[in-house]
Amino acid sequence: MQKGLPEALIQTYESPHTLTEEEEKLFAENMKWADAAAIGCGMTVCESGRRMLALAAAQETLPLVIDADGLNILADEESLGKLLKDRNRQEKNVVLTPHMGELARLLHKPIAEVVAAEIESTIQAAKETGCIVAGKSARTCVCSFGEPLFL
């Protein structure tokens, strides 16, 4: 990615499971000056992932794209979901990009139920999170609650 998009900031960490105090400070500083952030890809569901997602979510004006393990953390952390919903009341600047399995975890529903009603499930996720949701399957359904749906 760095070669194809040299202006992208890539930050690596010593351990995938814990952040040192210095790494946490660096991450928080990077979030303050960033134009946008994508979080979740390559992360693991662990304390450092939870902390990074919380730090990014706390930057209210920072547009975020949350994918992969960022979504899995969000599904397990009610307080993070509330934080995102609250910040999106003013400005919708968080995009969630779940595939059907991640969408099922976000909604706490069986995957078969979500797959059988993928459009309705994507709309429900947008309503519950206050975020823009791009539900991915053979087609992609993009919606923000109360706004037109795009397929």
Please describe what each predicted stretch is.
Residues 1-151:
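Glycine-rich phosphate/dinucleotide-binding loop and adjoining beta-alpha-beta core of small-molecule
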